[in-house]
């Protein structure tokens, strides 16, 4: 699978539909790599295994299109939220903000889409996985109003100017553009209701 260059330091392995496989973020920090999600396609696994140097994997959440290759790739360390670590029975749990050499910042991401989501910020870029997306219950798309408010505050606090959201085209967009959409949805809330229902997916 061919890597898609974002900056001199950052690249990605694009998402696929068949099999459903998330975008994989690749950040080069000196002699080591930070890999955000591992996808589920053979192409993503082969590309990750072809990287030279120490490999640190960060999993955005537990869904298989983001974690499916975890047994197929070689790595030195793996970080995820508590729910993902429990689901996979492995990894270092990230419960708060964590900072590493190379400007890597891991942070919990309040998400309606998946419990225990995790983001990765480096410089002007923040990888969010599916963290900004809604949940679906009984065929109805919705956001948890409280979590959506926390998500907006979390994104506002990031220094990043751009966000990268899995399965979305374009993968990269200005943070303010993503925030504008989330604020518009939050403005529809009914203070008496815990969820904000969406008209369509």
Residue ranges and their predicted role:
Residues 30-31, 50-54, 71-77, 102, ...:
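Short glycine/proline-enriched coil/turn segments at helix->beta-strand junctions
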Residues 1-49, 118-135:
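Conserved beta-strand hairpin/beta-sheet module of binuclear metal-dependent hydrolase folds
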Residues 19-21, 92-94, 114:
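Residues that act as N-cap/strand-start positions at coil-to-secondary-structure junctions
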Residues 40-100:
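Active-site HxH/HxHxD metal-binding segment of metal-dependent hydrolases
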Residues 4-6, 27, 94-102:
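Short acidic-hydrophobic surface loop/beta-edge motif
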Residues 13, 36, 93-94, 107-109:
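Hydrophobic residues at beta-strand termini and immediately following loops
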Residues 33, 41, 105, 110-199:
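Metallo-beta-lactamase
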């Amino acid at each position: 699978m061919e890597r898609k260059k974002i900056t001199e330091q950052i690249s990605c392995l694009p998402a696929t539909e068949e099999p459903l496989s998330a975008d994989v973020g690749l950040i080069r920090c000196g002699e080591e790599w930070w890999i955000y999600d591992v996808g589920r396609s053979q192409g993503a696994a082969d590309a990750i295994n072809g990287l030279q140097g120490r490999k640190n994997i960060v999993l955005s959440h537990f869904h298989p299109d983001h974690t499916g290759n975890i047994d197929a790739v070689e790595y030195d360390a793996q970080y995820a939220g508590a729910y993902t670590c429990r689901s996979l029975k492995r990894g270092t749990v990230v419960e708060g903000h964590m900072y590493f050499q190379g400007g890597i910042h891991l942070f919990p991401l309040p998400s309606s889409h998946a419990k225990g989501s995790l983001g990765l910020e480096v410089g002007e870029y923040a990888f969010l996985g599916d963290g900004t997306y809604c949940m679906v219950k009984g065929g109805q798309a919705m956001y948890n109003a409280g979590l959506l408010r926390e998500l907006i505050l979390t994104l506002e606090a990031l220094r990043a100017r751009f966000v990268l959201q899995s399965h979305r085209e374009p993968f990269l967009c200005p943070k303010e553009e993503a925030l504008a959409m989330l604020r518009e949805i939050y403005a529809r809330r009914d203070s008496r209701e815990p969820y904000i229902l969406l008209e369509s997916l």
